[in-house]
Amino acid sequence: MKKRGVLCEEEKEVKKRKLLEQIGDGHLPYLSSKDDTFYDLWGSCYSKLTLLQAKHVPVDLHHTVQNAFLSLLRNGCLFQDLVRLKGKDIITPVSRILIGRPGYTYKYLNTRLFAVPWINDELNTQYSTRNLLETYKAFSDLNDFLYSQTVNELQKLGKIHKDNFFQHSEYKEQIKSDQRPSTSNYENVKLHSMESFNVTLINYMDPQNMSFLKEEPYFGMGKMAVSWHHDENLVEQSTVAVYNYSYQESSNDVNGEDEDPTRWHVGLKIAWDIETPGLLMPLSSGDCYLMLDDLNKTHQHCVIAGCQPRFSSTHRVAESSTGTLQYIKSQCNSALQNLHMNPDTGAADLKNLEPNVLGQTEEIHNEVEFEWLRQFWFQGKRYNKCTTFWKEAMTELEIHWKQMETMTSLVLKAIENENLTVDEKCNILKNILPPLVERQDLRHDWRERCRSKLAKMLPPDQVPCFYPYWNDDNKTMPLPFDLHNIISALQKTLEENELKL
């Protein structure tokens, strides 16, 4: 699987500034459903956006999913994330929880969310209450439904694009009635993203509790709950499916008027394009929309806030090559292959002093510490409310990490060994110093993030924990937490040995 290429933040900022300069003091045009050419624009420029109206979703599924949303809210299982954007920490206005396949994670804005497992009969996962078990099962059922709808829509889309047999007038009517053109002789059409969604990111926001929401800057669509973006870290050309639920709806919402300002909307635009009008699609409670195939890559989307609290369940195929518990455990096992433990004495030794092997081990050491342990504990004790799965997983990963601390100490002892040649010492130092310097720098960065004013503003169970951390007098740890003196000594040793070559 291939990760969608993401522009670096600097490139995005340049493009954004250029776009705003081109717009000047005005706004770009956009169409909403009140405009006569709305459906023509949808069919010609946004054809990979599909709306599944609430009336076409099974009633019992509506009931269980909407109750599940409220259950998450009542049980305090929706959390604002302390994320990093453009080098600065911010608290998200939207509260979230990730639910999905056991052991899966999803990373956004330098924050790794850990999926609370949806029901798996083969997994002995403990949930804090029976009620939450049913809650997670509801999103698993919704996932199955949205996947089946996605497969159907991709099949229709593939046939449409292949034969181009319909006219815009027909297309307009079929969008209005929530029916896409189809044929009975569909076969052998290449489809993208047939893999099932592996996670869903649940979002909740009550705009009445938000003191400030930014105005949408390009089109003047309204106040944004979520600004323009591509969903990141997804499998390339994979569909994103969204279930929308606004509750405590006013009588104004029931009449179905598209221009009712209390309604929520999703906005779409072609990325960095000022020629094509934007599209603003109204959402009724219970509606689902699918961003099919490569739409998430070629277009950007935003969410325009209504007046009522809103939940959404956003189902996606997260890029999982380096984001699963199975993956990081495999990495640990690979690194620990070089560690020998004497079964009689318990003494530890390294099997191999090959510089590349030692360097790779230190890189895995960093990966476990900063992509998993510190990411998990930076989110406080929030997961205790949801499941024991990740606490147990982190306990196991911490054991492996401590073994790698031992391996680092053994490398340092080996460098002091006079049996190594000058060339061997230099090669080892050149391979281990970069990850050690990175470790020292990242430990400092994570400490500062945990001490920030924003971190202290979070609820007690969500306040970041700076962990792992230990004092120099901790005899259970083979190395000090602060590696400054060790790194300085190693750099000096490298310089001295290079002079001997």
From Swiss-Prot:
UniProt keywords, alphabetically: Cytoplasm, Dioxygenase, Iron, Metal-binding, Nucleus, Oxidoreductase
Binding site for Fe cation: 229, 231, 301
Keyword match Phosphoprotein: no
Primary location recorded for the protein, binned into one broad class: nucleus
Subcellular location: Nucleus; Nucleus speckle; Cytoplasm
Tagged with keyword Nucleus: yes
Enzyme class: oxidoreductase
Gene Ontology terms, MF aspect: broad specificity oxidative DNA demethylase activity; ferrous iron binding; mRNA N6-methyladenosine dioxygenase activity; oxidative RNA demethylase activity; tRNA demethylase activity
Cofactor stoichiometry and binding remark: Binds 1 Fe(2+) ion per subunit.
EC number of this enzyme: 1.14.11.-, 1.14.11.53
Gene3D superfamilies recorded: Alpha-ketoglutarate-dependent dioxygenase AlkB-like, FTO C-terminal domain
Cofactor requirement: Fe(2+)
GO biological process: DNA alkylation repair; motile cilium assembly; mRNA destabilization; regulation of multicellular organism growth; RNA repair
Residues that bind 2-oxoglutarate: 203, 289, 310-312, 314, 316
Residues binding substrate, per UniProt: 96, 108, 229-232
Pfam entry (one): FTO_CTD
GO CC annotations, alphabetized: cytoplasm; nuclear speck; nucleus
Regulation: Activated by ascorbate. Inhibited by N-oxalylglycine, fumarate and succinate.
This protein's domain notes: The 3D-structure of the Fe2OG dioxygenase domain is similar to that of the Fe2OG dioxygenase domain found in the bacterial DNA repair dioxygenase alkB and its mammalian orthologs, but sequence similarity is very low. As a consequence, the domain is not detected by protein signature databases.
Protein name (Swiss-Prot/TrEMBL): Alpha-ketoglutarate-dependent dioxygenase FTO
Taxonomic source organism: Xenopus laevis (African clawed frog)
Organism phylogeny: Eukaryota, Metazoa, Chordata, Craniata, Vertebrata
